[in-house]
Amino acid sequence: MEYEAKKGKKGFVSPIRRLVFPKAARQAAFRSSVSRRPLHSMPLYPPDYLIDPHILLCDYLEKEVKFLGHLTWVTSSLNPSSRDELLQLLDTARQLKELPLKTTPEQDSILSLSARCLLLTWRDNEELILRIPTHEIAAASYLQDDALHLLVLKTGLGVDPVPAGMDGSPGGSGRDPGPPGAAPEKRRVGTAERRHTICSLDWRVAWGGGAGAEARAAGGGGSLERQRAGARASGSWERRQTFSGSWERRHAGGGAGKPGGSWERRQASGGVGGSWERRHPGPNPLDPQNHSPDAYCNLVILAVANRDAAEESCALICQVFQIIYGDQSIECVDRAGYHYRSTPKRPWLSSCTMAPRTHLKRATVAHPHRLSTAPTAAVSTTAAGPSSSYRITWSRCGVSWVLLRSSSLHCCYETIVWGCLSRTTVQVCRNSMGTDGSSFSLECGPSSQIRTSATSRASWRVWVSARAESSLTALAASSAA
């Protein structure tokens, strides 16, 4: 009985305790007791904040930010580089109570970047907030509003919020965080890796096993919020509404009888599916050249520590974009107004400025070695001729050759990022090496190899054997003398 009486007084706090220890201090003490894991990150250096593209292709990078809100009613004609437009939009969102007036530690989140997508998760329980596919990114801009350093991401309509605590992705926790005083469960190993290997649409399809498939069979399709219309989801303003997503879904007049969704779904008379271009051969109202007021995009508002952190995040997002669209740039290509996406042309970077600035260490091999490179290797070799020798170095920035005084033979291997070679530099090297009759060919691609013809190999063996015989003759003559 005594235990039951004490249990009933659990929520009581004495007035003296309230005066001496305010609520904010008690919450800070509780937050400090929850340990946070170190981020999966690496140091990057200004002004370019360059990173090895293979890290973004095969791995991911995490940055700590504050998630302020996700606006879904923004027109696609918004200029993300205009400070006045962004400030006016942020003030309107604050008046509508869709953005907070100040930042709190509860807004701490993790921005995880990879070549496939951008992930936003809460810092403490690491529940998934947003998944933004790379092809949906339109622009990333930095904005300073009073003391806040804001990172604004303009994305397309293919971004759906995920209710907190209901992450059912194959690698998400999918569990209830429990009462506030309970200790959080240990994070599963490899969660972020599995989240980065699937896109947003694939995740929603993969999640639909068991209860999800039954819900869709009962007629509840769409995102998770629309399937769970009766439950109240915590988190941002959009996740607390009955219907999340674009502005039309939440403000479509006519109630449940009128289908919400994008402009194409509301304007489709025959009720057939598919994109707008297949049903209407005329001009596209989502074209930025002649856009329609009904075309909308999403804005993700993040707060960072300082200007350097914002510039680093913008640079990383630009590099993520250029990995997929190597011949285009995120600043001049706005994809938020399109429902269709162009096919990635090159999965590798085409600019030499994207290479990591790494100090190269050379290893000299004393014996001849057959030269072959992997996608992440570059080779430097010295080809000796009858009268002189040339050193040809091919790397990510091209091919260069220099005249050497001594006719030595050695091979040097350097581990840097592979890149394509220009035909001009290859032709110059071929012409310069044509003095002794040798020939070679270079090919650009992930499976590139450096091959020498049979004629050049035969002449090279003859020259090496003659050089060895002359060395032995000179050695014998010197010993005899």
Swiss-Prot record:
Gene: Ccm2l
GO BP annotation list: cardiac atrium morphogenesis; cardiac muscle tissue growth; homotypic cell-cell adhesion; negative regulation of homotypic cell-cell adhesion; positive regulation of fibroblast growth factor production; ventricular trabecula myocardium morphogenesis; wound healing
Taxonomic lineage of the native organism: Eukaryota, Metazoa, Chordata, Craniata, Vertebrata
Record protein name field: Cerebral cavernous malformations 2 protein-like
Annotated organism of origin: Mus musculus (Mouse)
Gene3D superfamilies per record: Pleckstrin-homology domain (PH domain)/Phosphotyrosine-binding domain (PTB) (2.30.29.30)
Composition bias, Basic and acidic residues: 184-193, 237-251
Location of region: Disordered: 161-193, 214-290
Biased composition (Gly residues): 214-223
Family: Belongs to the CCM2 family.
Classification via InterPro entries: Malcavernin, PH-like_dom_sf
